[in-house]
Amino acid sequence: MAKSAELTWLDALEAEESGDREAALGAAKKTVRIDPTHSDGWMGVARWTLPPETRGRQDMPDLQQSAKAMAALRKVVEIDPENFAAWRLGGVLLVDHLGMLEDGIRWWEARRAVAPYEVTPLIEQIGILVRLGYYEECASL
């Protein structure tokens, strides 16, 4: 009998705890194959596709890692729009790692549609606009 998505997800968490990120990623991918709506599984795919954090900072992912992680993060926020960790990681990837500032503005605008009274998306958008030199546009947010 095949394992359920939840049991496979538990395998992913156990692999992560033991330090085996590759096995964790494999189990997370299997989880979302079993249940494509498993938002934790998609979040695991995103996190474990990226290089591990060292000293509290994310190492710079390559383009392929970033693309795979962003695809998974888009699934997470589609399934669970309240998952702020997915929004935050997506913003970091787009703006800090890929330099896709305009896409970062759209990413945070989508978050504002979900959580209109949350301050973080507004601050992130203002930060991006300042980096682009669009100071006057900051006032219209």
Describe the residue ranges of each PLM region:
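Residue-level recognition of tetratricopeptide repeat
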Residues: 13, 47, 92-93, 127
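A conserved position within tetratricopeptide repeats
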Residues: 32, 77, 91, 95, ...
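Structural signature of tandem alpha-helical TPR/SEL1-like repeats
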Residues: 18-27, 53-75, 97-110, 132-141
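Short, charge-rich amphipathic alpha-helical segments embedded
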Residues: 30-51
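TPR-adjacent "capping" and linker segments in tetratricopeptide-repeat scaffold/adaptor proteins
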Residues: 1-8, 60
